[in-house]
Design a protein with these regions (language model features):
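PLP-dependent amino-acid enzyme catalytic core
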Residues: 2-398
């Protein structure tokens, strides 16, 4: 593996054992815990000036803070997504400024591309022939595209309710797909069954938190936000959350940026979930250290219908360590918030609307101040969820 000189190894979040990245493709071999990358901040030697002079955009711009060198990265030009001001929404919330980090501008229209780039790089370097994952839809399209870049096969296990565009483009990129009757947990069961088959021993899992590299890639979102704000740390970042990759990635980013001396503070990291599939919110409200399975998920926001998040405990840590909150939003409020952002010319998705609706709740409850700078993450292109947005307008008679 062509790793950066700053990468020390992979550390288990549970037992704290350290492992060699070249010998550890998935979870901790000692206890099965989630792995994260550990870095030598001195070896990275990253400064604001060195980043300003970087010869790459996107993920490769931050390669000294990542596991793989810029030249070895499987990339389709992910990252470098716009940070768009939303002054009308800021005025409604009564805060200093609102920005939307528009992840729909990534190559396959989803923030998943950040983590997929690193995870497929690792799979290639581990000698995999095929990558596989369960997904609500968008990450399957992403995996198919990046696997094609690396000349690997891919297979996505998706529920029947997955969006047409995600399923279609998974096939267009050359990926295999198993459409599983039922909902997301049924797709997970089918994936796990396939992974346990001896005939699939050469498959490499890209399931959330199975590989350390999807949450590693996710941290670059906050790297970019900080640089785009000229290193002024925002007061709040709101992450629509399924498994927790985004908020966990931002938590890793805050720690690493402070260790590197690039910033002194961290933003409050907030989790936003649909109120009828909100296991992180429920666990936070109860003061629990981990999530419990949400028994009856029921939301129009299919990308976030994840009743048993793989990163639930880590998402709770991210919220609590940074002084954030976990907030549920109704489907109607989420769709209305997405439409309002679209009225400002920001092509927000229904998934992004969950974060915007949660920000309204945070402001109403006094958790956002009049001078605060708030970043809303729009994880998916609005065009990928146009059907549910249009249906919302039709119900209103528009």
């Amino acid at each position: 593996m062509d790793t950066t000189t700053s990468l020390d190894g992979l550390v288990c979040a549970d037992c704290e054992a350290t492992h060699d990245p070249a010998a550890t493709p998935r979870r901790c071999p000692d206890c099965g815990g989630v792995l994260r990358a550990s870095y030598d901040a001195a070896a990275a030697a990253v400064t604001r000036e060195s980043l300003a002079g970087a010869r790459f955009d996107g993920l490769a711009r931050f390669s000294d803070l990542l596991p793989f060198t810029a030249d070895s990265l499987v990339t389709a030009g992910e990252g470098a997504t716009p940070l768009v001001p939303a002054p009308e929404f800021a005025a409604e919330l009564g805060v200093g400024a609102v920005y939307v980090k528009d992840e729909g501008a990534n190559p396959t229209g989803t923030t998943a591309d950040r983590g997929t780039a690193l995870a497929v790089t690792a799979a290639r370097d581990h000698g995999a022939e095929k990558v596989a994952l369960p997904t609500t839809g968008d990450a399957g399209q992403s995996a198919a595209a990046y696997a094609a870049r690396a000349d690997l096969d891919s297979e996505a296990f998706v529920p029947t309710r997955s969006t047409f565009v995600a399923k279609a483009m998974t096939n267009v990129h050359g990926g295999d797909m198993s459409v599983v009757e039922g909902r997301y947990p049924d797709a997970v069961d089918a994936f796990e069954g396939a992974m346990s088959d001896d005939d699939n021993a050469d498959w490499h899992s890209l399931a959330p938190f199975d590989t350390p590299y999807r949450h590693e890639g996710a941290k670059t979102l906050l790297f970019e936000v900080l640089e785009q704000l000229d290193w002024a740390v925002p007061d709040a970042v709101v992450h629509p959350t399924g498994h927790g990759l985004g908020v966990v990635g931002s938590h890793l980013a805050t720690d690493q940026m402070q260790e590197a001396g690039l910033v002194d503070d961290a933003p409050a990291l907030h989790v936003a979930q649909p109120e009828h599939c909100a296991p992180v919110v429920a666990a936070d409200d109860a003061g629990d250290d981990n999530t419990e399975v949400w028994e009856r998920p029921d939301t129009l926001i299919g990308a976030l219908e994840v009743p048993d998040p793989a990163g639930g405990a880590l998402a709770l840590d991210a919220v609590r360590d940074t002084g954030g909150w976990a907030v549920g939003a109704s489907d109607d409020d989420a769709l209305e918030a997405a439409v309002q952002l679209n009225a400002e010319g920001i092509e927000a998705s229904a998934t992004g609307g969950v974060g915007a609706a949660a920000a309204r709740e945070l402001a109403a409850d006094g958790h956002l101040g009049s001078d605060d700078t708030v970043v809303l993450v729009n994880p998916v292109a609005g065009t990928k969820e146009n059907d549910v947005l249009r249906s919302h307008l039709m119900r209103k008679g528009v």
